Amino acid sequence: MNNEFAFPRIIEKFSVAGELISCERYGEGHINDTFKVTMDDCGREVHYILQRINNRLFPDVDRLMHNIELVTEFCRKSVIERGGAPMRECLTLIRTKDGASYTCEDGNYFRMYVFIEGATTYQSVRDPRDFYESAVAFGKFANLLAKFDASQLYEVLPDFHNTRVRYENFLRAVEKDICGRAEEVRSEIDWVKSRSDLCGKIVDKIASGEIPLRVTHNDTKLNNVMLDDATGKGLAVIDLDTVMPGSLCYDFGDSIRFGCNSAAEDEPDTEKVHFLFDLYKTYLDGYLSAVGNSVTQEEKENLPTGAVLMTYECGMRFLTDYLEGDVYFRTHRARHNLERARTQFKLVDEMLACFSQMPAAVK
């Protein structure tokens, strides 16, 4: 039994039956502390996920859990309406005995979910089929929530994908140059400025109503999709801490940014970095097959723009952090954030080089 926290006392607060057998660290997440709980319920082992919420990153736990409660309940009802299996196809919160969605113990905040049996998350793509199935899962997630009023959600990370605001932050970092690094990255600074027209591509369309406000996941990587152990199919989307109002183009674009790179996100040698157009088409096919008619034509036409925009924005954030002294993203070596930024910028250049083909794949 892991003894990091008073697990018996914490678990006792939740509405779970049986006696506690074990509570051990689980998974490879970096934001929250995740544990697999095993209970003995009349001789039958039952599993749950217990998480200690990172309230340094998410200080307003009430708002965080408000979002998760609304989204998981809406997903559950949507799955039931379609004759699905809600305990396997979406996250299910376990309430505390007093009806709350989380509990606090010694200044630490905990929540509990039903453990989804017979499914696994993967840190990297084993073959293109995995990427396709992650696209299906995120497309289905968007489809399940298509009728949800996204204005009900709080922005737990304000202006997270407001690229105009990100650009303003970047310009301030360049002007202040608190670490004296601006001169060495002058070419990268000029590169970002020369493509600043990208900043308003999506956010302005949301403001004008051309693109609808949707529930967005905001961390659409493969490791946030549970794949069925038996079939390999995308089963459920997890890690809902960053669900907020936004555009489907953001979620689609972030998946492409992360998954269609021939190299690691922090590859120092940009000669190894290439945009994998075939994987882009694979993901697009899976996503559109699952999102169905819930996506508008305007959204469809802007999916390629979302891919370019999210990659540009991410690279700009890495460069901003480098200029500010590496205070946001965890680094493991000198110039780590600069290497990350250059990787993203190389991807943007390659995306733009074949951009005329990207919208055609949507048709």
Which positions does each model-derived feature cover?
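Juxta-kinase regulatory segment immediately upstream of eukaryotic protein kinase catalytic domains
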Residues: 1-24
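A structural signal for well-ordered alpha-helical scaffolds and beta->alpha junctions
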Residues: 3-4, 68, 280, 341
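Amphipathic alpha-helical segments that form well-ordered structural scaffolds
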Residues: 9-10, 140, 191-198, 282, ...
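A broad structural signal for short, well-ordered beta-strand segments within beta-sheet-rich domains
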Residues: 17-20, 45, 232-234
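Conserved ATP-binding subdomain of kinase catalytic cores across diverse folds
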Residues: 22-40, 45-172, 246-248, 259-260, ...
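ATP-dependent phospho-/nucleotidyl transfer catalytic cores
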Residues: 24-28, 51-62, 119-132, 147-217, ...
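Active-site Asp-x-Gly
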Residues: 59, 227-295, 328-337
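Helix-rich C-terminal or lid/interface subdomains of diverse kinases
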Residues: 165, 281-359
